[in-house]
Amino acid sequence: MSNSIAKQLKMSYYPQLDNMDMADVSNFLELNEEKHHIGCRNWVDKYNFQPLAAFTIAYSDKYIYVDFYVRGNNLRAVNHTNNSPVAEDSCVEFFLSIPESKEYWNFEFNCIGTVNASHRETRENPTRLTDCEIAQIKRFASCGATPFEEKEGIHSWNLMIAIPFSLIGLDATNLPELIKGN
């Protein structure tokens, strides 16, 4: 059950992001964009701890960029193959809904950037992205890309992602006025 409240965000447009490496994009967004607090936590009955989490968001001519910032108890990144159950690890999730579409897009990432991604009309019937589709998603993880077992203690990490408009069926030259996300 989610405890989030709808909030409208305006994404800033930065065409130069497409010519920067992902670490530089992360630094740019940190300096130029407002951080938005993530107050939603899934699986409350299974996990009683809520990490501090925030994100920045912007777009370019080709991508939607989201930089997640997380600080929490323990850190885990065991899953390292596409569409593996990254929700078992330290992870973040991003949903997108395109106007006039019955489907929504679900992107789950663990702290090393492993992705479990799909599009679907309902939770029960996902169409998983292929390895070729997932390869189009740019990722930069402050934890690196090597899997590791759970590390105890307080840890901070960030994950910078870039999702191509073409992957989610949008024409970057004719974007809709509104894209829903959470």
PLM region spans:
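Structural preference for beta-rich elements and adjacent junctions enriched in aromatics
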Residues: 1-182
